[in-house]
């Protein structure tokens, strides 16, 4: 009786661990698919380039020194463009 109970509990534990590991692997594979461009990040990068250069041009037209707008989130303004730090 004890051996049957131990065997059932062991099988249940292995099944739970296997299912959890399979779900984690599936989630990781979906996040790291190769060949699929991350359009959201590309759009953010383009927006940052645009924001920085436009703000600089507007300040130049106003006969003021170009004070580059600070880029946020690990980016800095360099040569009228936001670049990653």
From Swiss-Prot:
Tissue/organ expression: Expressed by the venom gland.
GO MF term (any one): toxin activity
Keyword Acetylation: no
A Pfam family annotated for this UniProt entry: Toxin_20
Disulfide bonds: 52-66, 56-77, 71-82
Stated role: Postsynaptic neurotoxin.
Family: Belongs to the neurotoxin 12 (Hwtx-2) family. 02 (Hwtx-2) subfamily.
UniProt name for this protein: U4-theraphotoxin-Hhn1u
